[in-house]
Amino acid sequence: MPLLGDDFPQLAVSTTHGPMKLPCDLKGSWFVLFSHPADFTPVCTTEFVAFQKLMPEFEKLGVKLIGLSIDQIQSHLKWIEWIKEKLGVEITFPVIAANDSIANQIGLLHPGKGTNTVRAVFIVDPNGKVRLVLYYPQEIGRNMEEIVRAVKALQTSDKNKVALPADWPNNGLIKDRAIIPPPPTEAEAKKRLKEYDGYDFWFCHKSL
């Protein structure tokens, strides 16, 4: 199972858009891989619709979406067709038809839950590094806005070499400002509050 900072495992997979090799085929792009327990299930259907409706947001961020479950390609295609016909939403991202081996390799099988994949999310950066992992129980659908926020936060942190507070960009203390890394030396600590806004030398922040 890949952990934070690990290379995303090399996977050769079959998808509704044809064969893919991950993360090679997406090198240079951020991607969000999310697994769902099964096709033709209510919670998963609401999630697919929600992901699709946020596609413009993900595209603005340069992020590719990929779904995954242990279902056959034909099942995926029939389900996608049902979503379009009944709900009026066309699913445009690829969906992986995984097997037990692939699911086990990335930690998606939950003991005691049969062969259904768990509700997981992996955010992977352009270098193929795992940057965020989320797991949800089968009974609870994901918050897609939080996944978008997490991608924005990771990209902002990488670009500006800063940390970001709780509920960013709407933090109750410092709003949309970013937290500056701790000073590396005693001398830097002494002048930190003269150069930046903050509560103490270890808690300084700035606008981006």
Curated annotation (Swiss-Prot):
GO cellular component terms listed in the entry, alphabetical order: cytosol
PROSITE patterns the record matches: THIOREDOXIN_2 (PS51352)
Other notes: The active site is a conserved redox-active cysteine residue, the peroxidatic cysteine (C(P)), which makes the nucleophilic attack on the peroxide substrate. The peroxide oxidizes the C(P)-SH to cysteine sulfenic acid (C(P)-SOH), which then reacts with another cysteine residue, the resolving cysteine (C(R)), to form a disulfide bridge. The disulfide is subsequently reduced by an appropriate electron donor to complete the catalytic cycle.
EC number: 1.11.1.24
Listed Pfam families: 1-cysPrx_C, AhpC-TSA
Quaternary structure (record): Homodecamer. Pentamer of dimers that assemble into a ring structure.
Keyword Disulfide bond listed: yes
Main location: cytoplasm
Function as written in the Swiss-Prot or TrEMBL entry: Thiol-specific peroxidase that catalyzes the reduction of hydrogen peroxide and organic hydroperoxides to water and alcohols, respectively. Plays a role in cell protection against oxidative stress by detoxifying peroxides.
Gene Ontology MF annotations: thioredoxin peroxidase activity
Record: active site: C44
Domain Thioredoxin stretches: 2-156
Keywords: Antioxidant, Cytoplasm, Disulfide bond, Oxidoreductase, Peroxidase, Redox-active center
Similarity comment: family membership: Belongs to the peroxiredoxin family. Prx6 subfamily.
Location in or out of the cell: Cytoplasm
Biological process per Gene Ontology, one example term: response to oxidative stress
Xref: SUPFAM superfamilies: Thioredoxin-like
Keyword Aminoacyl-tRNA synthetase: no
Binding positions for substrate per the UniProt entry: R119
Protein name, UniProt field: Peroxiredoxin
Lineage: Bacteria, Pseudomonadati, Spirochaetota, Spirochaetia, Spirochaetales
Organism, scientific name: Treponema denticola (strain ATCC 35405 / DSM 14222 / CIP 103919 / JCM 8153 / KCTC 15104)
Coiled coil residues, start to end: none
UniProt catalytic activity: a hydroperoxide + [thioredoxin]-dithiol = an alcohol + [thioredoxin]-disulfide + H2O
Stretch forming the signal peptide: none
